[in-house]
């Protein structure tokens, strides 16, 4: 396996200044996998494998979107119940999402099991997951070149010690500027010229 991606596969309902969508295919593993496969196809590289969980309501056409992009779905688990759902909106510069509702559904008890034939990928991408789950994925694999992880403000707020721990096992951490400030506990305030 060239690239192994572990994370969420979801249905998103999103509002933005440009419009809105209901129950669109989303999730961190979905976007990571499609982006990775796009780049790999351009460079004629080997495959991307995805490990995640969906519910019985996961549409055949959405599975086809992933498989027709060349993503290997041997690690996709179908569990009883509904697929993870997220509802939110983007405003202004669209740098951060505002969450309106999160329905974990089958994702709530997701414990990824990396298939044996995928345990030595060239690149491991732990997409947005609880840091303890990211740690378990890292412990199941021995990436040859690069270990990346993605995180978000939720995990900084509720699982900061676990996040700091798993970050030590990664070569690259992906967060936005607001999350970087949260994580570092630094709030920059510009001094007023009158303060000098």
What are these language model-derived features?
Residues 11-23, 38-125, 139-144:
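Conserved N-terminal subdomain of the carbohydrate kinase-like
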Residues 188-196:
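Single conserved hydrophobic/aromatic residue that forms the stacking wall/gate
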Residues 5, 49-52, 149:
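Structural beta-sheet core signal
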Residues 24-28:
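Short glycine/threonine-rich catalytic loop with a Thr-x-Gly-x-Asp
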Residues 1-15:
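Positively charged, low-complexity intrinsically disordered leader regions
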Residues 122-188:
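Conserved beta-alpha-beta core of the PfkB/ribokinase-like small-molecule kinase fold
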Residues 6-7, 101, 127, 150:
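Short beta-strand segments
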Residues 30-38:
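Histidine-anchored nucleotide/phosphate-binding helix
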């Amino acid at each position: 396996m060239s690239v192994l991606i572990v994370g969420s596969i979801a249905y998103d309902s999103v509002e933005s200044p440009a419009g809105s969508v209901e129950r669109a295919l989303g999730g961190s593993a979905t976007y990571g996998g499609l982006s990775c496969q796009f780049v790999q196809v351009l460079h004629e590289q080997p495959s991307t494998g995805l490990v995640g969980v969906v519910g019985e309501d996961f549409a055949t056409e959405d599975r086809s979107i992933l498989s027709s992009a060349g993503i290997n779905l041997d690690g996709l688990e179908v569990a009883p119940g509904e697929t993870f759902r997220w509802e939110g909106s983007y405003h202004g510069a669209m740098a951060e999402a505002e969450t309106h509702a999160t329905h974990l559904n089958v994702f709530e008890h997701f414990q990824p099991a990396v298939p044996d034939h995928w345990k030595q990928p060239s690149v491991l991408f732990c997409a947005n997951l609880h840091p303890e789950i990211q740690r378990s994925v890292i412990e199941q694999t021995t990436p040859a070149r690069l270990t990346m992880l993605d995180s978000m403000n939720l995990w900084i707020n509720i699982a900061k010690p676990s996040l700091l721990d798993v970050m030590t096992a990664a070569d690259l951490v992906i967060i936005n500027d607001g999350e970087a400030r949260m994580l570092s506990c630094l709030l920059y305030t510009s001094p007023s010229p009158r303060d000098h």
